[in-house]
Amino acid sequence: MTLANDPIVIVSAVRTPMGGLQGDLKSLTAPQLGAAAIRAAVERAGVAPDSVEQVLFGCVLPAGLGQAPARQAALGAGLSKSTTCTTLN
């Protein structure tokens, strides 16, 4: 199978920085950090934000983040409301 025939394509991956307890990133929520990572991944891949069909978002401690952290991050990154989002614990 060639890439052109495969309907699933991973075009980019980015991770957030590793922070310390009460460090420089303490004012940001996981979805806010995720939005920055998603924006960077989309920019690096050179694709339009509305062409992203799915987001898989890892979140170790989702308590207190509200509903659907993956959805929050995707919308914060400017992706389409039609993008499917899954939060992985």
Describe these PLM feature segments.
Residues 48-54, 82-84:
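Short acidic capping loops at alpha-helix termini that bridge into adjacent secondary structure
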Residues 2, 45, 57-63:
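N-terminal glycine-rich phosphate/pyrophosphate-binding loops that anchor nucleotide-derived ligands
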Residues 28, 59-89:
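Conserved catalytic cysteine-centered active-site region
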Residues 1-31, 40:
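Condensing-enzyme catalytic core mediating Claisen C-C bond formation in acyl metabolism
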Residues 1-4, 43-45, 76-77:
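Terminal domain-initiation and capping elements
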Residues 31-46, 69-73:
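Short, well-ordered amphipathic alpha-helical segments that serve as non-catalytic structural scaffolds
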Residues 9, 56, 87:
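Conserved beta-strand segments that form the floor/walls of ligand-binding pockets within enzyme
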